[in-house]
Amino acid sequence: MRGYLVAIFLSAVFLYYVLHCILWGTNVYWVAPVEMKRRNKIQPCLSKPAFASLLRFHQFHPFLCAADFRKIASLYGSDKFDLPYGMRTSAEYFRLALSKLQSCDLFDEFDNIPCKKCVVVGNGGVLKNKTLGEKIDSYDVIIRMNNGPVLGHEEEVGRRTTFRLFYPESVFSDPIHNDPNTTMILTAFKPHDLRWLLELLMGDKINTNGFWKKPALNLIYKPYQIRILDPFIIRTAAYELLHFPKVFPKNQKPKHPTTGIIAITLAFYICHEVHLAGFKYNFSDLKSPLHYYGNATMSLMNKNAYHNVTAEQLFLKDIIEKNLVINLTQD
């Protein structure tokens, strides 16, 4: 009898092992966060993109993965900078936040379209009454930012969103804005941003200290939708594209790239062709609308001490005139 029970036990163990291997091998079950790593790659193209000369590295995976983020940081130099452009003193914050996410994939595992044509949709008032929605929705990849709404503005900006960049102070908190097909990308500028994400994912009380305005107190997105942007992307925008100094004079506030420029930089790394919409500002009329939504005016942009809007406009003018990108809202 005892031998019979042992045989049954061993058979059960073997059956469990076989089923375990089959199910995990076919990705039926969720991948454990601590083992989270890249499962797909950017499809290469035979020809170089028009903007290739702007980048020092190509085919860079833009999202951090729990399995190798420290190795990637060392390889690309992010371990030599503090936030917002590195993780030298914040690696543990990154580790904790990444451990609660379910994926660091770039595209859906069944998406094998190479040479992607992308549009980066800014929030500029120039989009008002432009009726670009249908055209925007025709792109392979649509990148949006912050709390620029789609709902109620479909004719102007379209319906689809592939990626949306955000930070704690700019993310939607009303579930009406959640599109389950959108990947949300946290751009971390300070340790508080990572702590905020961790607290939300764990269901803890949110510590609102250290933010320039009150961050969202609830998360309308599922963990599978969230990614953390590699600081290398933001660093590239600041130092390689906008040529910001690494050290600002003591009497000046450090300048950082806007989310729009960061989104364009992201597009350079994952797309073969990049088009822009909503990146033109009317500085000649400070009463003109700042965004295609809401009532904010251009006077608000003039008061922003944390961004160098002049440098960004010169950069945009340069890449448009050189045909490195196509501007859908030129006029």
Swiss-Prot record:
GO BP terms, alphabetized: cellular response to interleukin-6; glycolipid biosynthetic process; protein glycosylation
- Chief location: Golgi
TM stretches of this protein? 5-25
Q: What's its catalytic activity? A: a neolactoside nLc4Cer(d18:1(4E)) + CMP-N-acetyl-beta-neuraminate = a neolactoside IV(3)-alpha-NeuAc-nLc4Cer(d18:1(4E)) + CMP + H(+); a beta-D-galactosyl-(1->4)-N-acetyl-beta-D-glucosaminyl derivative + CMP-N-acetyl-beta-neuraminate = an N-acetyl-alpha-neuraminyl-(2->3)-beta-D-galactosyl-(1->4)-N-acetyl-beta-D-glucosaminyl derivative + CMP + H(+); a neolactoside nLc6Cer(d18:1(4E)) + CMP-N-acetyl-beta-neuraminate = a neolactoside VI(3)-alpha-NeuNAc-nLc6Cer(d18:1(4E)) + CMP + H(+)
Ranges in the topological domain labelled Lumenal: 26-331
- Glycosylated residues (UniProt): 129, 181, 282, 295, 308, 327
Keyword line = Glycoprotein, Glycosyltransferase, Golgi apparatus, Membrane, Signal-anchor, Transferase, Transmembrane, Transmembrane helix
Q: Top-level EC class, please?
A: transferase
Tell me which domain of life the UniProt entry assigns to the organism this sequence originates from. Eukaryota
Membrane topology is: Single-pass type II membrane protein
Q: Does the keyword Membrane apply?
A: yes
E.C. numbers:
2.4.3.6
Tell me, in a sentence or two, what this protein's role is: Transfers the sialyl residue from CMP-N-acetyl-beta-neuraminate to the terminal galactose residue on sugar chains of glycoproteins and glycolipids. It's alpha-2,3-sialyltransferase activity is specific toward type II glycan chains (Galbeta1-4GlcNAc) on glycoproteins and glycolipids such as neolactosides nLc4Cer and nLc6Cer, whose sialyl-products serve as precursors for the Lewis X antigen. Critically involved in the synthesis of functional selectin ligands needed for neutrophil recruitment during inflammation and lymphocyte homing to the lymph nodes.
Tell me the protein family, please. Belongs to the glycosyltransferase 29 family.
Any idea what this protein is called?
A: Type 2 lactosamine alpha-2,3-sialyltransferase
What is the species listed in this Swiss-Prot or TrEMBL entry?
A: Pan troglodytes
